[in-house]
From Swiss-Prot:
GO cellular component: cytoplasm; ribonuclease H2 complex
Keywords: Cytoplasm, Endonuclease, Hydrolase, Manganese, Metal-binding, Nuclease
HAMAP family named among the record's database cross-references: RNase_HII_A
Catalyzed reactions: Endonucleolytic cleavage to 5'-phosphomonoester
Binding positions (a divalent metal cation): D6, E7, D103
Protein name per Swiss-Prot or TrEMBL: Ribonuclease HII
Length: 212
C-alpha cells in the first residue's frame, strides 16, 4: 500500500487550500496510470472530474483537509501544510502503507522527519504529482474538491475568476468589492501582500496574528 498526498490552492488569494491524500495498492496504481491519471494541472476540468469518480472508486480510501483563509492569515503556511499531512497520514494509517509520497514544497526535511516519526518511509520529491501516480491521484482529488468549493463561493460573491493573484479577473473583482464594502469577505487571504496595493484596508500582517 502507498499513500500519495498533494494540495490545491496553496498560492491562491481566494478560498481554502485543499490537501488530499489517497491510499492505494500497487496493482490499482497500474490501473490508474493506464487510464491516464496524471498531475491535475495537465488535465482539463472535464477530464479531472471524470477521473475523480474513477480515482475515488479505485483507491482504498481518500481523505481531505481544508485549510481556510483565516488559518492561513494567522499561521505559517508550511506549518499548516505539515499539520494537514500529519492528519491525512494518521487517518489512513489503518491500511498500513509502506511509503508516503508527498510533493516537495520548500524545505523537504520537516516533511521527511514528520513522516518518519509517524513510522513510515518517505518519498518527498519535487513534482511528485507528475512523477508518481499516487500523488497524481491525490492532486486530482484536491483540485476537483477545490474547484467545486470555488463554484459555491462564486454563487455568493460573484465571478472572481480563478481566485489566484495573477488572474486579472480576480484582481478586478477584489478592487470592485473593496470599493463597495468596508469589511473584507472571509473568503480572501488578508495576509497576501498584493492587498497592500489593491485593498490596503483589508491587509493584515501575519506578524500580529490577528483574527478576523
Amino acid at each position: 500500500m502507498r499513500v500519495g498526498i498533494d494540495e490545491a490552492g496553496r498560492g491562491a488569494l481566494i478560498g481554502p487550500m485543499i490537501v488530499a491524500g489517497v491510499v492505494i495498492s500497487d496493482t490499482k496504481l497500474k490501473f490508474l496510470k493506464g487510464i491516464g491519471v496524471k498531475d491535475s494541472k495537465q488535465l482539463t476540468r472535464e477530464r479531472r472530474e471524470k477521473l475523480f469518480d474513477i480515482v475515488a472508486n479505485t483507491v482504498e480510501a481518500f481523505t481531505v483537509v481544508k485549510v481556510f483563509p483565516y488559518e492561513i492569515d494567522n499561521y505559517n503556511l508550511n506549518d499548516l501544510t505539515y499539520d494537514a499531512v500529519s492528519k491525512i497520514i494518521l487517518s489512513l494509517s489503518s491500511f498500513n502503507p509502506e511509503i508516503v509520497t508527498v510533493d516537495k514544497v520548500g524545505d523537504e526535511k520537516p516533511v521527511i522527519e514528520l513522516i518518519n516519526k509517524l513510522g513510515y518511509k518517505s518519498n518527498v520529491v519535487h513534482k511528485a504529482d507528475v512523477l508518481f501516480v499516487e500523488a497524481s491521484a491525490a492532486s486530482i482529488i484536491a483540485k476537483v474538491i477545490r474547484d467545486n468549493y470555488i463554484d459555491e463561493l462564486k454563487q455568493v460573491y460573484g465571478d472572481f475568476g480563478s481566485g489566484y493573484p495573477a488572474d486579472p479577473r480576480t484582481i478586478k473583482w477584489l478592487k470592485s468589492f473593496y470599493e463597495k464594502n468596508p469589511n473584507p469577505p472571509p473568503i480572501i487571504r488578508r495576509s497576501w501582500k498584493i492587498l497592500r496595493s489593491t485593498a490596503p484596508l483589508y491587509y493584515i500582517s501575519k506578524e500580529g496574528r490577528r483574527l478576523w
